[in-house]
Curated annotation (Swiss-Prot):
It comes from Anaplasma phagocytophilum (strain HZ). Its EC number is 2.5.1.75. This is tRNA dimethylallyltransferase. The record marks S98, R120 as: Interaction with substrate tRNA. GO terms for biological process: tRNA modification. ATP binds at G10, P11, T12, A13, S14, G15, K16, S17. The gene is miaA. The lineage of its organism: Bacteria, Pseudomonadati, Pseudomonadota, Alphaproteobacteria, Rickettsiales. Residues 35-38 are annotated as: Interaction with substrate tRNA.
């Protein structure tokens, strides 16, 4: 059987995960996560992990919030899961909206040297002492190319600083000169881009639902771990605002409104990235039904649904 992969991506709250769960009801497949926050355990509500994780769901909630994780480590894990799916003759369906993970999947990763733990510690301590804005300015002062990074993307600016400190060379230079080897050749990339008004309404409603369930308890759990605010899991949608609410710095509804606004802005940036950074043969869909119908039409005959599934 041909080694195929389907990638279903899109902005936060677009409905891609729900679409994949519906696809899995009619297709013999594995749903493999490529969301950089849904990898963490202990925060399923905050990170909007599948409500009922089945044996077909892979790479959800398996990383400790305190663990230092990266797109490179995720790529190793996803290669293993994809190979296992192929060995079991089921279709790997990779879903999530994290640009770093999607980019590493479709374009590969540059061969940047490993960062010394002391360099990483120094960079993180400097970020904590300076704050995000001043840290970004310090980075740009040393590497003008870093101005191309978004100042609120803490992970990227921290990574750029670490690489510059470790190697003396801009991360952009590494990206340009290091050959990227694509991990997979036969990826069909599908993007779910609902109309903006529907997407924003879904974001607003989803965050209210999160706040009414266990999101606050999950943030309390993260705070009990004494994680720095620049830790990746602390950047989950709503986490910074809930922390401020729990610390008495803002009111409940203010936290809700700020989180909704920040998430809408993030979704807007995601939409721009999907339209400009993905391969030219990427296909775009405006509704769940369209993307579900496409996947089933393309793959149902090759991967018919069976009553028993491998439990690897």
């Amino acid at each position: 059987m041909e080694k195929e992969i389907v990638v279903v991506t899109g902005p936060t709250a677009s409905g891609k995960s729900a679409a994949c769960d519906i696809i899995a009801d009619d297709l013999n497949c594995r749903v493999i996560n490529c969301d950089s926050k849904q990898i963490y355990h202990g925060v399923p509500i905050l990170t909007d992990q599948p409500v009922s994780v089945r044996d077909i769901h892979k790479l959800y909630g398996y990383v400790a919030p305190t663990q230092n994780y990266s797109a490179g480590l995720w790529l190793q894990d996803v290669k293993r899961e994809v190979q296992q799916a192929w060995d079991d003759n089921v279709l790997p369906v990779i879903t999530g909206g994290s640009g770093m993970y999607i980019n590493s999947l479709v374009n590969g990763i540059s061969d940047i040297p490993a960062i010394d733990p002391e360099v990483r510690k120094t960079a993180r301590n400097l970020l904590e002492s300076l704050g995000n804005a001043a840290f970004y300015e310090a980075l740009v002062a040393r590497d003008s190319n870093a101005a191309r990074l978004h100042h609120n993307n803490t992970h990227q600016i921290l990574r750029a600083f670490e690489v510059l400190e470790q190697t003396g060379t801009s991360i952009f230079t590494w990206w340009e000169r290091s050959p990227r080897i694509k991990p997979f050749e036969n990826c069909e990339v599908l993007v779910l881009l609902p109309p903006r008004n529907k997407l924003y309404d879904k974001i607003n409603r989803r965050f209210l639902t999160m706040m009414q369930t266990d999101a606050i308890s999950e943030v309390k759990y993260l705070m009990s771990l004494n994680l720095p605010m620049h830790a990746p899991v602390m950047k989950a949608h709503g986490a910074p605002e809930i922390v401020q609410y729990l610390q008495g710095k803002i009111e409940f509804m203010e936290a809700v409104e700020i989180a909704q606004k920040n998430t809408r802005h993030y979704a807007k940036r995601q939409c721009t990235w999907f339209r400009t950074q993905l391969p030219c043969d990427t296909r775009f869909f405006s509704s769940q039904n369209e993307i579900i119908d496409h996947v089933l039409a393309q793959y149902a005959s090759k991967y018919p649904r069976t009553h028993t599934r491998p439990c690897n």
